[in-house]
């Protein structure tokens, strides 16, 4: 029986057909506006596919347009770009779309190098040569296999569990649950399954694995049922920290369309993930009770929080397809910034939202200092370093209490989460304003 072929909902763009006749020998700077615009648009949509915000996408398109002697205006969203190029006599307008969204910091870095070298090298290449070069960049897929990404999620959620107050038992169960859950998500994503299926399947499996391990420990070793408090930590790999934070940055630059679309996407993921976890909790009879308190001194808390924050940020960076060197840099910044945030809450009684702002500001300033040494785009370091500060547990507890109609408790959790989520991009934005002259002005 012949296998049914699924037709793509978004047709592929034949980029090489935009090159002029005999265009293989003519520098793109001397080619037609259609050929120039095809290069600009393709680079823009490739930047967008990496998960970066509208301001950075437009900046890269402007750099190419200036080098090619034309003007470009672009309207950028989460999944699409509509842009027009002018050369004084003619105009060329095009609409481009992605089939899915995600984060790929390695591809983003390669595109950044392409933009930096375009003035000296790129504009003297032909359109055909440029599209061939971009073909190679576009093939930049994941550095890591699904098992490796499962391990990264396991490490990240294990660290996350300790930072939220969990002990060794919760950390181990979350490690296994998150690893299995993210492995399944990666396999489903690789086969291009739809977003909702990937979220529901991976979250359900992660919660089921946590509950299964806990029940096994209860039977074999008499483990207390109160350790169920950490089951939600097993699904925190699904929290869309990158679009949450980039939406705030886009809104700060008045890129309203991109900011609102990114925020909507993040809220959709949160809604589906928390609803899936809530239903699993009802099936498995799990409740988001408080963690059993750990007896640690202040010095021990600081040391272990540094270590857990490092592991958490490192895991999330790997999940964003960051090379190990970049992941280590982000993890170092995240360890300092997140530990500072937590200690400000514990030792100085600063409200969590204010502490989140200070932590994000610190991460942004440290990333600016290390930007030239690391050699990677700033956003590849800053966003992963503060993703661990996104209050996924607060969001889940808010939804759980909403589901059981404890409306006042739900409102309290949601309010706390919203304040922290608002504070995180604000911290990065002010760090960028202080350290980046181009970002400081409305141009």
Regions found by a protein language model. Name each.
Residues 118-132, 147-157, 175-185, 281-288, ...:
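Hydrophobic, membrane-facing alpha-helical anchors
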Residues 143-246, 319-320, 324, 329:
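Core alpha-helical transmembrane segments of integral membrane proteins
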Residues 159-164, 180-189, 205, 209-217, ...:
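Alpha-helical membrane-inserting segments
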Residues 163-177, 226-240, 292-308, 348-362, ...:
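Structural signature of hydrophobic alpha-helical transmembrane segments
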Residues 230-235, 246-250, 254-270, 332-443:
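C-terminal transmembrane helix-loop-helix hairpin of multi-pass membrane proteins
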Residues 237-242, 265-349:
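Generic multipass alpha-helical transmembrane bundles of integral membrane proteins
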């Amino acid at each position: 029986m012949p296998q049914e072929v699924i037709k793509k909902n978004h047709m592929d763009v034949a980029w090489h057909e935009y090159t002029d006749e005999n265009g293989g020998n003519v520098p793109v700077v001397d080619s037609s506006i259609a050929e120039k615009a095809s290069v600009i648009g393709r680079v823009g949509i490739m930047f967008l596919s990496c998960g970066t915000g509208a301001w950075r996408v437009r900046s890269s398109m402007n750099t190419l347009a200036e080098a090619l002697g034309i003007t470009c205006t672009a309207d950028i969203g989460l999944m699409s770009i509509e842009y027009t190029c002018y050369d004084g006599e003619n105009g060329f307008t095009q609409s481009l779309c992605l089939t899915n969204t995600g984060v790929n910091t390695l591809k983003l870095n390669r595109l950044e190098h392409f933009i930096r070298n375009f003035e000296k090298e790129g504009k003297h290449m032909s359109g055909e040569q440029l599209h061939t070069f971009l073909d190679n960049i576009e093939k930049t897929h994941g550095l890591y296999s699904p098992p490796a990404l499962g391990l990264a999620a396991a490490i990240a959620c294990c660290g996350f569990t300790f930072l939220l107050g969990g002990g060794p038992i919760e950390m181990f169960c979350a490690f296994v649950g998150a690893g299995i859950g993210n492995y399944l998500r990666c396999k489903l994503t690789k086969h291009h399954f739809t977003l909702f299926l990937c979220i529901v399947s991976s979250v359900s499996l992660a919660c089921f694995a946590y509950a299964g391990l806990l029940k096994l420990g209860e039977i074999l070793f008499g483990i207390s049922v109160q350790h169920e408090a950490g089951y939600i930590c097993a699904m925190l790999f699904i929290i869309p920290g990158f679009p949450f934070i980039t939406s705030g940055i886009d809104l700060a630059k008045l890129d309203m369309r991109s900011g609102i679309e990114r925020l909507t996407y993040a809220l959709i993921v949160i809604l589906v993930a928390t609803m899936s976890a809530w239903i699993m909790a009802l099936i498995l009879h799990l409740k988001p009770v408080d963690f059993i308190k750990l007896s640690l001194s202040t010095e021990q808390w600081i040391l272990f929080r540094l270590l857990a924050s490092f592991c958490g940020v490192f895991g999330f960076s790997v999940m964003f397809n960051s090379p190990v060197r970049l992941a280590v840099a982000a993890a170092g910044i995240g360890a300092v910034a997140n530990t500072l945030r937590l200690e400000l809450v514990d030792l100085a009684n600063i409200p969590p939202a204010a502490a989140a702002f200070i932590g994000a500001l610190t991460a942004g300033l440290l990333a600016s200092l290390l930007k030239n040494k690391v050699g990677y785009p700033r956003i590849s370091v800053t966003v992963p370093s503060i993703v661990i500060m996104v209050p996924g547990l607060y969001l889940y507890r808010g939804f759980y209490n909403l589901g059981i109609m404890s409306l006042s408790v739900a409102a309290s959790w949601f309010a706390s989460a919203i304040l922290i989520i608002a504070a995180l991009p604000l911290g990065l934005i002010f760090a960028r304003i202080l350290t980046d002259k181009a970002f400081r002005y409305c141009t």
